Amino acid sequence: MAEFFLVKIKRKRKKVPFQNDLVKELTNVILKSAKGDKVVFGSRAIMESMAYMMERMITRGSVSAPDYPYNAAEMVVDYIYPEFGKDKLNIIALCDACMQFSEPGKIFVQTLEVFKSQKFIPDNANQVIDHFYSTPCIQIGKTVSMVQGLISMGMMVGDRLKLYLQGNDFMPFSNVIHKLLGFGMNERIKNRYFMLDIVRKDYVLDNPLLQRYIAVVGAPIIKDCNEDYWSILPKGFSSADYWIDYFPAIEQVYNCLSKGQTICDMIPWCEKSPKVNVDDRCYMEPWSRVTDTYLCPYAMLWKNWNLEGYIPTI
């Protein structure tokens, strides 16, 4: 969305799509523009906002981007408490802290409102992170510290993710989980300000901290301005033992089963792959690739989730 002039922020309760005993509803934060457009301010908007702010601060020649989602966090800060956002590091710190919660949009807005009521302007963006680490959190009905919550949630997420593809044949998938979660928990425990420190180390090509992180954990799938796709693997790993592309494939299968989506959005990525031959099935029935000799990530998930032979009712 190229231009989005924020005029209203609204909270809306939403029932979770899958019943469980712990969470019945979630809070969606809705942003409304002067033109009447409505968008959700949640994890994607916060993540993209933080990344775009950091890109502008540590790279050269950064291009302008649509207001939503890339400027969403800055727009919310300008709307609620503009004084807080005069130092962009404050916004980055708030984004980073809120992304550690299950309802980041709700926490982002609530925290800004608390800061405004207290007239709190940090002398250093680290104080924003400290605010969260000094405040107890509620996790699955229990009061925990931020560090305790981080460790227990990281372990739980790792256990759940490994259930998607089980067995020794899928160690490349488990490698990604161990590497990313292990790094994330370890780095946050050792240095809770590491996101801020990346920016403070300045220009990306001369940034020793970012270079170390990329060497250790690589980078997610990247799409550049030429619509080309790239991945940076951790040092010592090859694509054969580090299956990063299975994570977007999980989303594609979910979109098919829960939303009736027939097209696989990984087509641009697979078109660059030396092994996957994109054809009409990818647009109309990607699950039918389960009979191929070489299974793409979508088909591999479909087969190993015992869905072979199942045809979705769209």
Regions of interest found by a model, annotated:
Residues 1-61:
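Metalloprotease/metallohydrolase-associated module, dominated by Zn2+-dependent proteases
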Residues 1-8, 64-314:
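Non-catalytic terminal regions of proteins
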